Amino acid sequence: MNKLKLIFAGTPDFAARHLAALLSSDHEVVAVYTQPDKPAGRGQKLTASPVKELALTHNLPVYQPASLRKEEAQAELASLGADLMVVVAYGLILPKVVLDTPRLGCINVHGSLLPRWRGAAPIQRSIWAGDTETGVTIMQMDVGLDTGAMIRKVTCPIAANETSTSLYDKLAELGPQALVDTINAMAAGETAAEEQDDALANYAEKLSKEEARIDWSMEAVAIDRCIRAFNPWPISWFEVAGQTIKVWQAEVINSDHGQPTGTLLKADKQGIDIATGLGVLRLLTLQPPGKKAMSVSDLLNSRRDWFEPGTQLN
């Protein structure tokens, strides 16, 4: 097997886990690209990405262009003489000239079984839609949005209580080994790519805080999926007594209620039961304004007046 010279491009922790796997492989990471440092925290202090932090601990050259569309940035990348560029949740668009620069092009690790869930939020949308299976796809990048030919797929089940946090961790365990296996196969000239069927494609739109507002007219199972999909961001929410309450955890109670949707049916230490379009949703872990997430029993100790049975939620 030939040893390949790699450029790695990525930004969040998910990407850093893949970089770590490459650093333990037989290949050479010659440079790392990541997003420019961004303000974070209450002090809005400029903060390096997880990928940059890992790269610096390994004394790797780090490049942080705001765009790869400028000739200067493209020439700089070309001067690295890489065989392959690996892209994992980088966050910048790669122009065709960049895609064509490395000898073997650019490959991407995507958190879904393409062509299902192309786009920005595949992990969240797979839970939101009620999928029972997802996985990681390694693809050869082209100029489209997640449209490139697929080199390798690995699958994993989506559990009934899966959140985006837990599924993210599952895929972050699966992806790195799949990536290393793919690069090893490419180095040996043993890969075969499969074109995507565009007729089977759908798009994982970005999440928004407004979308996370709970619609009690939906079925309880659908609301529960939203709550799990929007954890850890933007967190599903509703309003009661003029307060915005975030919902971190709930469960579906299969019972008829005969009440208008959004009616608060009962509130006790087991949970807060809400009438939905079909079935009852029991709220288990809530976060009131300015507080950390807490169990319903803890919240009722201080704010039972917000959750009187018969209260109508918007």
Curated annotation (Swiss-Prot):
Catalytic activity: L-methionyl-tRNA(fMet) + (6R)-10-formyltetrahydrofolate = N-formyl-L-methionyl-tRNA(fMet) + (6S)-5,6,7,8-tetrahydrofolate + H(+)
InterPro entries reported in the protein's UniProt record: Fmt, Formyl_trans_C, Formyl_trans_C_sf, Formyl_transf_N, Formyl_transf_N_sf, Formyl_transferase-like_C_sf, GART_AS, Met-tRNA-FMT_C
EC primary class: transferase
Entry annotated with the keyword Transferase: yes
Domain of life: Bacteria
Pfam families hit by this protein: Formyl_trans_C, Formyl_trans_N
Molecular function in Gene Ontology: methionyl-tRNA formyltransferase activity
GO CC entries: cytosol
PROSITE patterns, alphabetized: GART
CDD domains per the UniProt record, alphabetical: FMT_core_Met-tRNA-FMT_N, Met_tRNA_FMT_C
Catalytic activity, EC: 2.1.2.9
Similarity comment: Belongs to the Fmt family.
Name this protein carries in UniProt: Methionyl-tRNA formyltransferase
Organismal lineage: Bacteria, Pseudomonadati, Pseudomonadota, Gammaproteobacteria, Aeromonadales
Gene this chain is encoded by: fmt
